[in-house]
Every structure is written in structure tokens, then in C-alpha cells.
Amino acid sequence: RTCLEGLRVLDLTSFIAGPFCPMLLADLGAEVVKIESAEGDPFRMAAFAFAGWNRGKRSLVLDLKTSAGRDVFLDLARHADAVVDNLRPGVLARLGLGTEALRAANPRLVHTSITGYGTDGPLAPLPGFDPSPPTTRSPTSYQTFGYADSCSMASPTPPGASAVNAATFSVV
């Protein structure tokens, strides 16, 4: 028996920071169902990384833009313990699947949303992938690509490691 056996998680994530959290839950025994559109997760282009970040998960194709897809998702949410997404703020609400709709379907459901810039404020609607946040609001944004005139403010130099993506799961 594992420590999270019996826990059911719906995974609406892609790329790195999003899938890492549900991956850890699956590693600890939770049943994780990754929901993808018919086009699939764009991170599938990195096959080995995709397989690693999505190990231990079941996969289900749903078109959340249709009423049938939304109905199936809400039925799954009625029997789930958590939903994890890394969509831009407001995307699920526009689909009729925001936190209020999820809680109406299942009042004990935990909804975790991983965003690049939070849920409100001027940058909230923007997609954010590491190193986007560190290069827009940190000393990294002042680094240049080695130009002689360091005041030229050339394109930001991202950090070598994907620190934000790797650390996000510890906050979630």
C-alpha cells in the first residue's frame, strides 16, 4: 500500500512545471488521469522528457470546448480529489470549468493552478514558462549576451538551469 493510494487527480497540465506535480503524486500512489486534447500535449515533441514527466499517469482525450467533453470532465471531477492545471488564468472559467463549477460538482475538490505570473495583475493573462518570470522581474533581465556595451540592454540571458520549473512542485 502506498501513502496516496485511493487519491484521484485530474491533470490538465503540459510542459514541465505542470506535469511534475501530478507525476510526484502518481509516484506516491495516486491515480492520476492526464486530460489531453485530440492534438495532444505540445510537450510530446520531447518524447523522453514527456514520458518521464508523465510516468504513472493514465491518459484520456477530451475536447473541453464541447459540451460533451465538459460533461465528461465534470463527471470525472465529481469522483476526484484534486485537479491540477497550468493554463492561463481564466481559461477554465471561459470553458465553464472554473473553480466555482468544479466546487459545485465536488465541494471537497482541491483545485491547484500553476501560472507563470499569478492569477491577477497586469501580467496574469500571459503564458509563462521558465525562464519567463525570472527574466522579466529579476537581475537576470539586466544581463546581456556579452556585448561590449553592457548598457545596451540586449535580450535577457536566461539562467542555465530551469530553476522555476524545478522548484514549482515544492510550492504546490
Task: Tell what function each PLM region has.
Residues 1-139, 143-148, 172:
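N-terminal helix-loop segment corresponding to the beta1-alpha1 unit
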